[in-house]
């Protein structure tokens, strides 16, 4: 979305990879500073974790916007961030937890997966837990495992949790779709068909892989998707506002509960992209 929008506004974009580690993210911010750009977009970096590095950006007077930098969304986010673009993360968690409750009733046994590296992930997982328990459901375990290590950890974790909880484990809720990229093989190895084992639901973000699992009846039942492409356009718009000395828009996008039935209506698309003329609207704002 950012690259598409940058093409429309006429900007050059350089992508720097944080490589899924704290050190990598710090290094990427340092590289960005060295380039002396007109603006910086922080994509999925925790502002608290990277506070020292972000202070360098602020001290250099380089405008900065972010996607999912922390729990506070919208204008004037912590860390000197002009705007933090996101859906309301608490709403996303509530929608995912309510799906599990609607699906299994108050007899559900939930395992929640999160990553304490990110404050927003902690807050989302806490809201999942609060919502399930407030309705009378049971949270069997609250699992803290790094998103960056899901490929190596989720298989053994899934096997261990199945052995520990058996049929009591009815639903798996995670703060991100990535956790379910690597859960299916362990469930299959345990002899569980997709409709038999713990039903998986994600409180964000609506990846293509998740859409494909949901569409095909794989080992994920729902996700609560964000309009990621639209948010890319909003990031460019917010950064343009910062560069021009204008006010932040304050716009907050709405999430969508994505189910197999809903995807059938979408056709072949594996992306939640709202049917609205947002590209034309932003281009008009930019005078393009």
Spell out what each predicted region is:
Residues 48, 52-91, 207-216, 220:
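Flexible loop/hinge segments that line or gate small-molecule binding clefts
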Residues 135, 227, 231-288:
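Hinge/cleft segment of the Venus flytrap/periplasmic-binding protein
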């Amino acid at each position: 979305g950012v690259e598409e929008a940058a093409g429309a506004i006429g900007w050059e974009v350089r992508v720097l990879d944080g490589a899924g580690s704290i050190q990598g993210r710090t290094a990427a911010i340092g590289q960005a500073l060295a380039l002396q750009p007109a603006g910086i977009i922080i994509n999925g970096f925790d502002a608290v974790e990277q506070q020292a590095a972000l202070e360098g950006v602020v001290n250099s007077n380089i405008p900065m916007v972010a996607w999912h930098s922390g729990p506070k969304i919208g204008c004037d986010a912590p860390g000197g961030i002009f705007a933090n673009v996101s859906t309301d993360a608490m709403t996303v968690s509530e929608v995912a937890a309510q799906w599990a409750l609607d699906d299994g009733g108050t007899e559900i046994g939930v395992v929640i997966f999160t990553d304490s590296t990110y404050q927003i992930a902690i807050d989302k997982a806490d809201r999942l837990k609060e919502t399930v328990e407030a309705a009378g459901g049971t949270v069997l375990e609250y699992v803290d495992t790094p998103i960056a290590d899901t490929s190596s950890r989720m298989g053994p974790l899934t096997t261990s949790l199945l052995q520990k909880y058996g049929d009591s484990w009815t639903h798996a809720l995670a703060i991100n779709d990535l956790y379910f990229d690597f859960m299916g093989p362990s469930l299959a190895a345990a002899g569980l068909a997709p409709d038999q084992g713990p039903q998986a639901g994600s409180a964000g973000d609506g990846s293509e892989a998740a859409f494909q699992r949901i569409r095909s009846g794989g080992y994920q039942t729902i996700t609560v998707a964000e309009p990621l492409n639209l948010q890319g356009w909003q990031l460019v718009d917010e950064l343009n506002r910062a560069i021009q000395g204008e006010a932040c828009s304050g716009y907050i996008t709405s999430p969508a509960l994505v189910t197999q039935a809903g995807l059938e209506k979408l056709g072949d698309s594996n992306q939640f992209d709202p049917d609205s003329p947002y590209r034309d609207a932003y281009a008009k704002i930019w005078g393009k």
